[in-house]
Regions:
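Glycine/small-residue-rich phosphate/adenosyl-binding loop
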Residues: 1-54
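Short, hinge-like loop/turn segments at secondary-structure boundaries
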Residues: 15-17, 87-90
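A short, structural micro-pattern
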Residues: 21, 89-92, 110
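Short, surface-exposed beta-edge/turn micro-motifs
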Residues: 23-25, 68, 93
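Small-aliphatic-rich amphipathic alpha-helix that forms the alpha element of a beta-alpha
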Residues: 27, 35, 42-83
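Conserved residues at the C-terminal ends of beta-strands
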Residues: 30, 73, 98-99
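Short proline/glycine-enriched turn/loop segments at secondary-structure junctions
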Residues: 82-88, 105-108
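C-terminal helix-cap and adjacent tail motif
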Residues: 94-122
Length: 122
């Protein structure tokens, strides 16, 4: 989405996360639940996994190119769909603004590997 008025309305539909409207574009990541592999152990839909992987790869490559992104998962899906005329059979999984950052993010210390990884059992 490049249109400024639409970006501002998407920011409003994203629980008033207005910073996203400042990016040159907002990517709206969608999937087709009816056209996906339906057997993933009945605990997860493959369309969501597929779209999430695609968005994450996009975000990693954007970082490599010096671009900034931010996964936006908090939004009113029906409002987003109405704004963009997204068909009923299509689900919106995430939004991400994309552009060159205005500032460097502040450093946040990372957890030690032992704090987040388990071996052999939880």
């Amino acid at each position: 989405v490049k249109n400024q008025a639409l970006k501002e309305r998407l920011a409003e539909a994203s629980l008033r996360q207005y910073f996203i409207s400042k990016a040159p574009i907002i990517i709206v990541a969608c999937g087709f639940p009816d056209n996906c592999y339906s057997r993933m152990g009945n605990y997860m839909k493959s369309w969501a996994v597929d779209v999430a992987c695609a968005v994450e790869h996009l975000m990693l490559q954007a970082e490599e190119e010096g671009l900034g992104t931010c996964w936006i998962g908090a939004f009113e899906e029906m409002e987003v769909k109405a704004l963009l005329n997204i068909p009923e059979n299509v689900k919106v999984l995430a939004l991400t603004p994309l552009g060159y950052p205005d500032e460097e993010p502040r450093y946040r210390p990372r957890k030690e590997l032992e704090e987040i990884v388990s071996y052999d059992k939880y």
